[in-house]
């Protein structure tokens, strides 16, 4: 079904699909769909993991689960978004807060071997992710901090909340601090 949807998008034949809002608690993901766009917020807590790099794919995706907000059109313009990852600045994905000088360590062979390929990357203790939805609108929250386990010692912490309404998305952040500039 997904391959069919991608193929349809590549040829300008998309459908609006279901409209609504849903929080997927097991994957710390909120999906907000409307007739002309879809929003996906990917978050990470102690129960979920960072993106994995396998067989040379996702080599710079370690921040994708750090609150990234992806907005996709659901009309024929959706096809142009299929090639976007090729030109992304992986430290500046919409919605994430990351130290811009942190290395993409997760898939570095030397570091991975030294760590014994210790996957998955989990958030340090104390992180929280949650959300609520009535099926039409929703709210999601994430409290996270970088600095323990396999993550760089940036000391980055942040609380963020997302409110998704019919035609408005509000994102609020608080408590941002870091050991690095």
Briefly describe each language-model feature range.
Residues 1-181:
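Extended polysaccharide-engagement surfaces of secreted carbohydrate-active enzymes
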């Amino acid at each position: 079904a997904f391959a069919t949807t991608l193929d349809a998008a590549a040829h300008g034949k998309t459908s609006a699909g279901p409209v609504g809002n849903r929080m997927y608690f097991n994957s710390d993901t909120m999906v907000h769909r409307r007739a002309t766009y879809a929003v996906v917020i990917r978050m990470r807590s102690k129960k979920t993991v960072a993106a994995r790099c396998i067989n040379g794919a996702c080599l710079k995706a370690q921040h994708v689960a750090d609150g990234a907000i992806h907005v996709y059109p659901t009309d024929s313009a959706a096809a142009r978004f299929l090639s976007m990852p090729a030109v992304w600045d992986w430290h500046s994905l919409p919605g994430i807060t990351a130290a811009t000088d942190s290395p993409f360590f997760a898939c570095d062979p030397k570091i991975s071997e030294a760590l014994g390929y210790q996957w998955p990357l989990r958030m340090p203790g104390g992180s929280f992710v949650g959300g609520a939805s009535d099926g039409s609108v929703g709210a999601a929250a994430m409290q996270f901090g970088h600095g323990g386990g396999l993550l760089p010692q940036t000391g980055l912490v942040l609380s963020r909340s997302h409110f998704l309404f019919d035609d408005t998305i509000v994102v609020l952040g608080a408590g941002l601090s870091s050991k690095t500039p």
